[in-house]
Amino acid sequence: VRRHVLFAEEEIGSGDLLMIVKNNYHYTGKQQQQDRQENPEQQPGDTNFIANGDTARLRRIRRFEDFYGFRFAQASLVFPDYDDMELECQVLLDTLSSESPALTREQSSRLFFAVAEDYADIPSKAKRYKEVRENPYFNAMQVKFAYAVTCHKAQGGQWRCVFVDRMLFGEETISRDLLRWLYTALTRATEKLYFINFDERFFEDK
């Protein structure tokens, strides 16, 4: 969609729509701490974490970085579902084009131990572990482009206009699982709904 409809050729750029693909607790806590320092009288927000499936708009990229065998972007993300909350964070770019939903277990372990090497001089194992858990690269937002999403990822969200492509479900005959999938897909639209690659047997004759 991004390349053939929006004619975007760069790896990622300002304005791109992204979906978070793994819960992230690091940056919201950091942002709330900064807000309290800047405005002590301000009431703390109720956004404790960014959830898997949340969408964000990429406002700007400060720089690209290659660390620990992975590629990152230091970026600013705006979250429309959280009153346009803006977070400065590291974004992990490897997940954009990977086949897996997020980093695999092997990749996560590789990143963990690569980051841990930076703290090898800390004698306490518990303190080393704590440093890794607070490292911005280890906690980078794992994202994918959100111009088209699976029905599973779309659960809980709604859009004015929705395109439903049945071919993504496969050639399976009408079954209970397919009908459940259809119900979820069809109820994501609030105004317009378009059916793609649907056989006419799915529609009643008038």
Regions from the language model: what does each represent?
Residues 1-205:
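Core RecA-like ATPase module of SF1/SF2 helicases and allied nucleic-acid translocases
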